[in-house]
Amino acid sequence: MGHRWGFLIVFLGAVGLLGSGYGRQQPSETAAQRCFCQVSGYLDDCTCDVETIDRFNNYRLFPRLQKLLESDYFRYYKVNLKRPCPFWNDINQCGRRDCAVKPCQSDEIPDGIKSASYKYSEEANNLIEECEQAERLGAVDESLSEETQKAVLQWTKHDDSSDNFCEADDIQSPDAEYVDLLLNPERYTGYKGPDAWKIWNVIYEENCFKPQTIKRPLNPLASGQGKSEENTFYSWLEGLCVEKRAFYRLISGLHASINVHLSARYLLQDTWLEKKWGHNITEFQQRFDGILTEGEGPRRLKNLYFLYLIELRALSKVVPFFERPDFQLFTGNKVQDAENKMLLLDILHEIKSFPLHFDENSFFAGDKKEANKLKEDFRLHFRNISRIMDCVGCLKCRLWGKLQTQGLGTALKILFSEKLIANMPESGPSYEFHLTRQEIVSLFNAFGRISTSVKELENFRNLLQNIH
C-alpha cells in the first residue's frame, strides 16, 4: 500500500467527535503523549473504552486470530484486479515493483477451494456436485432435483441481493485470480501524491453525506483552510444523525487502520542484498501526532477503535451461522478443516464474551419509512465506495482496499440481518441469510487488519515513549 495512501491520513478528513485542544500542548510532552494522550477513555456513541479494547484484543484475541488467518481457507482470496474504474479514465498505474500483486498458480490452490462448491456447506456441496462444471452457478442443470434447483437459485439470488453492501467481483470472470494474502501483505509500496489523494477525496467528499459547503480539515486538494473551517466541520458532524455520523467514522477508522499498517510495515532498507521492513516512527507521527496534524491524528485513532467495535459486534452476531453443523471451512483436507472450524468457533465465542459490545439498536430506529430510506442511502453510499476501489492505481493497494471494504460491507450486512440470522434453520440450506466464501474470507481478514492495527498501536506507543 502506498506511501501515503499513507500520507493522506495527515491531510484527509478522518474524523472523530472531540474538539481539538492541541494549542495548549507543552513542548515537554513525549511523542507518545502527543499521539495517544487523547486516545483513551470512552469512545463517542459507545459504552466501551479504549483500554478495554486494548486488553481484549492484544492478549486474548490477536494471537488466535492470526493463526486462523494463516490457514488455507483464509489466505487465498479470489479477486479481479483488472476491472475498469467506473468513474474516470485517467488512472496512472503505479509501476513500482512493490505495487505489484503476484497471483497464485492453479496448482497452488487447494482443490476444495478451487471447486465451485466451496461456497457452501458440506450438505450443500453434495446437493450441487453435479453443477460444478456449469459456467455460472445460476445455470442450473435441468436434470437436477427440484429441491437442488431451488437451493442453487436461492443462493444465486442471495449473492446478488439488495442486502449486500458491496459491489461484488464476478469471481467467475477470466480476469479473476486467486491471491495468497500471506505472500502479498499490506505494507508501504511508494504509491503517493495526487492520484492517491484523489481516491480518498472522492470517498469523503461524495460518499459520506457531506455537503460541498462544509470543508474537511487538512484536505490536500483544498487551499486556504483554517481553524474556522475545522470548527464548522465538527459542528456539522455533531449535528448529524447517529447513522450518518457513524458512517463517516467507519470510513475514517478504515483510513486510519490502513495508515497504521503502512507505518508499521515500512520499507526501511532496500538494497540488492535484502529489503528490510519495519516500524517507521516518523511516518506514524506525521499521520497521528496531535501537533503535526493539528489535533486530527488522535481523532482518527479513536475512529479506528470505533471501527473495531462495529466489526467485533458483527462477528458476535453471526455466531449461529458458523455454529451450524453442516458449515465447514472446506478446503478438501478434512482434518485441518475440522481443526480450523474449532479454532474459528473458539475465536467467535471469545468475541461473544466481550463485555462492552456496541449497541446497534440505535441505528435506523424511529419512523419505519424514514429508517428504511436512511438504511438504503447508507447501503448505496458504501456500495459506491467499494466501486471506487477499482480506481486505485496501485494493484496491491487495490487488493487490500477491495478486501477491506468487502469485509466491512459484510459486517454491516450482518448487523442489519439480525432477524434473518435468528430464523435460520439449525441444519440444511439457509435461504434467507447466507455468506459466500468471499464474504467470509474478507470479513475475517478485514477484522484481522483492524486487530493488527490495534496491536501495532501498542508497539508504537512503546517506541515513542522516550522520544520528545
Curated annotation (Swiss-Prot):
Q: Describe how it is modified after translation.
A: The Cys-94/Cys-99 and Cys-394/Cys-397 disulfide bonds constitute the redox-active center. The Cys-94/Cys-99 disulfide bond may accept electron from P4HB and funnel them to the active site disulfide Cys-394/Cys-397. The regulatory Cys-99/Cys-104 disulfide bond stabilizes the other regulatory bond Cys-94/Cys-131. Phosphorylated on Ser-145 by FAM20C in the Golgi which increases its enzymatic activity. Phosphorylation is induced by lactation. It is also induced by hypoxia and reductive stress.
EC numbers: 1.8.4.-
GO-annotated molecular function? FAD binding; oxidoreductase activity; protein-disulfide reductase activity; thiol oxidase activity
What are its GO biological-process terms?
Answer: cell redox homeostasis; intrinsic apoptotic signaling pathway in response to endoplasmic reticulum stress; protein folding; protein folding in endoplasmic reticulum; release of sequestered calcium ion into cytosol; response to endoplasmic reticulum stress
GO terms under cellular component: dendrite; endoplasmic reticulum; endoplasmic reticulum membrane; extracellular space; Golgi lumen
Membrane topology field = Peripheral membrane protein
Q: Which UniProt keywords apply?
A: Apoptosis, Cell projection, Disulfide bond, Electron transport, Endoplasmic reticulum, FAD, Flavoprotein, Glycoprotein, Golgi apparatus, Membrane, Oxidoreductase, Phosphoprotein, Redox-active center, Secreted, Signal, Transport
In Pfam terms, one family for this protein is ERO1
In-chain residues carrying the UniProt-annotated modification Phosphoserine: S106, S143, S145
| Signal peptide per UniProt | 1-23
* List of glycosylated residues: N280, N384
Binding-site residues, FAD: R187, T189, W200, S252, H255, R287, R300
Q: Which domain of life is it from?
A: Eukaryota
Q: How is its activity regulated?
A: Enzyme activity is tightly regulated to prevent the accumulation of reactive oxygen species in the endoplasmic reticulum. Reversibly down-regulated by the formation of disulfide bonds between the active site Cys-94 and Cys-131, and between Cys-99 and Cys-104. Glutathione may be required to regulate its activity in the endoplasmic reticulum.
Which EC main class describes this enzyme?
A: oxidoreductase
List, separated by semicolons, the cofactors it needs.
FAD
Disulfide bridge positions per record:
C35-C48, C37-C46, C85-C391, C94-C99, C94-C131, C99-C104, C208-C241, C394-C397
State its location(s): Endoplasmic reticulum membrane; Golgi apparatus lumen; Secreted; Cell projection, Dendrite
As for family, the record states: Belongs to the EROs family.
This molecule's function is given as:
Oxidoreductase involved in disulfide bond formation in the endoplasmic reticulum. Efficiently reoxidizes P4HB/PDI, the enzyme catalyzing protein disulfide formation, in order to allow P4HB to sustain additional rounds of disulfide formation. Following P4HB reoxidation, passes its electrons to molecular oxygen via FAD, leading to the production of reactive oxygen species (ROS) in the cell. Required for the proper folding of immunoglobulins. Plays an important role in ER stress-induced, CHOP-dependent apoptosis by activating the inositol 1,4,5-trisphosphate receptor IP3R1.
Could you describe the subunit structure of this protein? Predominantly monomer. May function both as a monomer and a homodimer. Interacts with PDILT. Interacts with ERP44; the interaction results in retention of ERO1A in the endoplasmic reticulum.
Q: What is this protein called?
A: ERO1-like protein alpha
Give the organism, scientific name: Sus scrofa
